[in-house]
Amino acid sequence: MKNITNTSSLTNYTLVNDTIQLRLNFNTEIYIQNDVKLRLVKNIIERLNLTELKKVYSSFGRKPTVNPVTMLEIIIYCYSEGIFTSREIEKSCKYDLRIRYLLDGSKAPDHTTINRFRQKILELTPDILKQMVQILIEENQIDLTSIYIDGTKIEAYANRYSFVWRGSIEKWQEKLIEKIKKELGLSKNLTPDQVLQAVTTIFNQLRKYCKQKKIKFVYGKGKRKTKEQRDYELLKDWKEKLETYRKHLEIMGDYRNSYSKTDHDATFMRMKEDHMKNGQLKPAYNIQLASASGFIVGEKVSHHPSDMYTLKPFLKKLLENYQGKLEKIVADAGYESEENYVFLAENKLTSYIKPSNYEKSKTRKYKKEMEFRNNLTYDETKDQYISSDGKEFIRCKDRKRNHKSGYITTTKVYICFDWNKEGQKTKGIYIAETFQKYREESLKNIKSDQGIEERLNRSIQAEGAFSKIKSGLNYNRFHHIGKENIISEICLLSIALNLNKLTSKIENKNLEIIKYKAA
């Protein structure tokens, strides 16, 4: 036996190199035999159609370290355990026996291999989620008759102060265009693109002229620039600024009012987590999830901070994936709009959307106003309303509003010009007939016994999904940039949550379809 003395001045001890008898059991089955989730992830992956997944690696050249099916199993399992970064997944592949079992003797992939694989499956993850939901439907774990929808904002992986505002861009663009039109004598009716085209044409002509005349440009102190050089530099500056403004507006598109310079798909939104209490805007994505029977059945990633504009495109996607299976749509007050009501009616879906004035309708002031409205008598011949004391409300105009989605709503405006009550000379009432009709139907639905039960399930299932993501898995900020990456990330998270839910049901020996009952 050889003694090695440590000569460090900080410690004084002796290290002994001795022989240690190791007893290793290479049968990992012994250690993971009771892990339901591990066996479940393998069983589910085996039932998926992974033809496209197997094509992500080329059949030519070097063989991949780990085959794509095993890589998918590893990523889904790690996500279900709250492990998201490539380096943490790499560490799990090296030291976690459960992941070693999935690898089945293969070499542990490094973080670059894991990241490359995630990039290769960006377009495949939505279909994998859809296939998993179909398996759960076949196993009688999901009933799609009631869909519970909710949304949340998750911060993007972008710098918080990298904002570009539409208002600022449009303001400076307008000022510059006015200046250019005045200097160049252009028509006031020209659009920004036409002004840019005119400036570019003049700039190119001047550049060609300077080249032909061999005009020398000078820079620095004590140098006097020619008129041609000054005009050239001014036109170049105008051209570059106009192109920059146009690029900013193109990135934002028609519906957004901001974007981040470090993640062009992220929009600045007001978050619930406001530690400074100043309403600070942060770059984020609006994430929509649809739940049924405790499982996530669909996702939607939106630039728009309002939930109202996300419902219609989200439902189109769900109807395409699960044709003829959806019956009831349950959502909170943020989704209420005439456009959404009409879409639900056209697709024969029952609305359980909570009216945005539901809490306000319980106040004494609102009840008094509604009592006044209900006592009005409508005269069809004159198209006017008459109050109980004979006051006439004459239809003055129709107010049309064009929403960002392109949908146009019409509100009829009736005014009484001789009201002379409560300090008011006139009084107006505004009636949106289509919206009011659907709102009353939805209100009736949510107040019924069935509606109370559906609202209870929405609050538990839909909001519970985001609780599991943010609190359960501690996922409060994305780790990737770009909408395509975010969609893939949300799909993987949804698959992981579904895996956890099914594991919990199996361990608790409760495989009935989840439906919470009102007390």
Say what each PLM segment does.
Residues 46-54, 77-84, 95-102:
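Short helix-loop boundary/capping segments at the starts of domains
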Residues 30, 62-67, 78-82, 103, ...:
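Short secondary-structure transition/capping motifs
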Residues 1-27, 180, 204, 219, ...:
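Short, flexible loop/hinge motifs at secondary-structure junctions
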Residues 63, 100-106, 134:
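Catalytic micro-motifs at enzyme active sites that drive phosphoryl/nucleotidyl and oxygen chemistry
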Residues 15, 75, 82-95, 106-519:
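Anion-binding and metal-coordination hotspots
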Residues 23-32, 448-453:
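Short, charged, low-complexity loops and linkers
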Residues 32-76:
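Basic, short loop/linker segments at the boundary and entry of helix-turn-helix/winged-helix-like folds
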Residues 11, 57-62, 450-453:
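A ubiquitous short alpha-helical element
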